[in-house]
């Protein structure tokens, strides 16, 4: 799971309303400073030092998001952290050169924006490329976990991971999304004035960095980041010495007793998830805990008692015809229910907005923005329109890349017919526009939900023999096309508010995407070879690989693939997901804001409760910090959380190299009953 899937991105963002963002953007002092500031040409906004910094940040965060994808699948938004690191890296570099008496190019907000865009595009491939979901769902282990004898899961319907074909798949699908809506960027950003709240919040952050007060605050954030990065890295290094065997170390510490530990209720000292909990909202973290209590505390023990009644007593713990089948399909019901509601919600909001805009135009009642437009807005629009991107380039590139995909993808996957790819690419512009428009209004990128719909359609269309592979690949095709086009509009909004040229933003996106298509497969294979990825009872569970494959099986076989009484339970949880969302949207805010998020609730159903406890620990830290020192907390929470995530995440790299070299920890720390 990622920031797009969980609440469409908005749920995991640092809460900032568009109105507040625009107020900050329009402050007289900031406006005057920007008016006096020279806006560099677009070629000066894309620098060699910036691309090196973006590559380093992209690699660091690719390692982090890959670890998160292959453990729980829950990924908080890291855009704020990436913008902070981009600022720290370049400001530190320029200060170091100044002390040495070496003249250097000034570090501008435009260069900062391009670096952040490039780095985010790079690590987005790490979690959006499907390494923990639809691509991993193609491998043999996931095929076996889904049940080799399961109807629809036909023999041979798997493809083992490979650096070559994975890189080729990403290269043939990731760039098309950048060109889909390129001719409509002015319509979405300037004419329709869509807010793109996450893009606006990132712009406000970057603009704030490049002020005298922002520079002072950044120094405090640097110290906070480095301190907690060091603590997190050293703690992870220390923990490693005690993991010399199965179920060993602090990761298996029975915090609440051995009985609770058996049901996965323990604090595992994972500072990555403590940091993630500090970034995510309290509602997300409490929803995770509620889902963990409901599933591992109540439902799974009760269903487990029906062994021999509801399902065969001979079924193994990981069999889809046993308890694991209930865990998997009920989780899917929550995800699909939440996705269905939010998909319909965004479509309705989009249609209402288009209708209202059309009605105002028809009545000639449009607000006369041109006469009252602020000088600051006029400057932004002038910069945004100055460096035009030729429309012919977008159309030609889209056609050329589409032809390449139509040829290559059926060669990679014999189950995927060439006309499946053509249909996906013909529908992409319309679907991409709907998604980008809805994202601009609601901050909910529905790319993953479009992908799930495509999964069911292609799986059912391809039939029993080819359906699973065709569904998973079709899901990846549509998701990449729709997701990336909306992300690009987010970045254009950020560039519009930071006076950054659309050309330099597009170059940053293209370079970052190219970096990601190379870095992400290499990072994935480092983990895939070093650890037992996909083991449902291990640390590297990669739960969404199995979820996506099981969704494809349902697309092929229908509800006959479900275990006994599972359909009724799935229907109940699907309805719960819809009703919970309805209650949150239509009840008075003082009641609706306490409704749990079904998408967050679903994650612990397969993964376990321990990481939810870690996330809640992070939430508790933020709550207490704001309670006793709110001003300092508002400044340092993002930096401290980023330090905790990066320190623990970076340790994964040397630990995986040690595992590949067959170097094992010297101690196994286990806990057993005293009697």
UniProtKB/Swiss-Prot annotation:
Recorded hits in InterPro entries, A to Z, give: OPT, YSL-like
Q: Which terms does the record give in the GO molecular function aspect?
A: iron-nicotianamine transmembrane transporter activity; oligopeptide transmembrane transporter activity
Q: Where is the composition biased (Gly residues)?
A: 1-11
Q: What membrane topology was assigned to this protein in its record?
A: Multi-pass membrane protein
Q: In which tissues is it expressed?
A: Expressed in roots.
Where is the region Disordered?
1-20
Give the GO cellular component terms, alphabetically.
Answer: plasma membrane
**Biological process (GO) annotations?**
response to iron ion; seed development
Coiled coil residues, start to end: none
Transmembrane portions of the chain = 50-70, 73-93, 118-138, 162-182, 231-251, 283-303, 329-349, 393-413, 421-441, 453-473, 507-527, 567-587, 605-625, 633-653
A Pfam family found in this protein is OPT
Localization, UniProt: Membrane
Q: Which UniProt keywords apply?
A: Membrane, Transmembrane, Transmembrane helix, Transport
What induces or represses this gene? In root stele by iron deficiency.
What family classification does the UniProt entry report for this protein? Answer: Belongs to the YSL (TC 2.A.67.2) family.
What is this protein's function per UniProt? May be involved in the transport of nicotianamine-chelated metals.
Name-wise, this protein is: Probable metal-nicotianamine transporter YSL16
| Gene encoding the protein | YSL16
